[in-house]
């Protein structure tokens, strides 16, 4: 039943979403949008090395998109780049391939497990995970380009 996906835990998460707003100086921002439901999540991320040190988000989403964003916001600080990539893949498999929910830092995502039976809700549930990985990828790409530029300048001199 659809009541399963809008359970008490989901509604409590959606109603208590931390870290709302935007960072004044993010290392990268990314936006993910669901064409199906119109939900949009924009994230701002700061990193030190491969660790996320600050995070904020602007969430215009249904209860499921908001709940998944709340889970991300509660647990992303201190996460490593590979960790957020891994949790995105675990979430995708949980929803689309009947895989197990995440464990560890992002274990609260287990509350989203009933969403797997409602394909139309998968995209909004994945928005925050996709946006965070996109922002991390952007940060790493910028760093790689900067390192290549420095290496190129050193070879010229």
Which residue ranges define each predicted feature?
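C-terminal binding/interaction regions
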Residues: 1-21, 79-157
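Catalytic-loop motifs flanking and including active-site residues across diverse enzymes
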Residues: 64-69, 124-127
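Structured beta-strand/loop patches that form or line metal/cofactor-binding pockets in enzymes
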Residues: 13-59
């Amino acid at each position: 039943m659809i009541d399963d996906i809008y359970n008490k835990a989901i509604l409590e998460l959606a109603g208590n979403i931390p870290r709302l707003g935007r960072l004044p100086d993010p290392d990268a921002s990314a936006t993910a949008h669901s064409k199906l439901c119109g939900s949009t999540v924009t994230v701002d991320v700061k990193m030190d090395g491969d660790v996320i040190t600050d995070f904020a988000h602007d969430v215009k989403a249904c209860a499921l998109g908001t709940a998944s964003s709340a889970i991300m916001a509660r647990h992303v600080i201190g996460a490593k780049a590979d960790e957020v990539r891994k949790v995105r893949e675990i979430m995708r498999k949980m929803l689309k391939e009947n895989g197990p929910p995440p464990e560890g830092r992002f274990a609260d995502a287990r509350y989203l497990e009933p969403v797997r039976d409602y394909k139309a809700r998968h995209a909004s549930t994945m928005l925050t995970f996709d946006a965070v990985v996109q922002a991390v990828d952007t940060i790493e790409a910028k760093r790689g380009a900067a390192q290549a530029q420095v290496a190129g300048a050193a070879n010229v001199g």
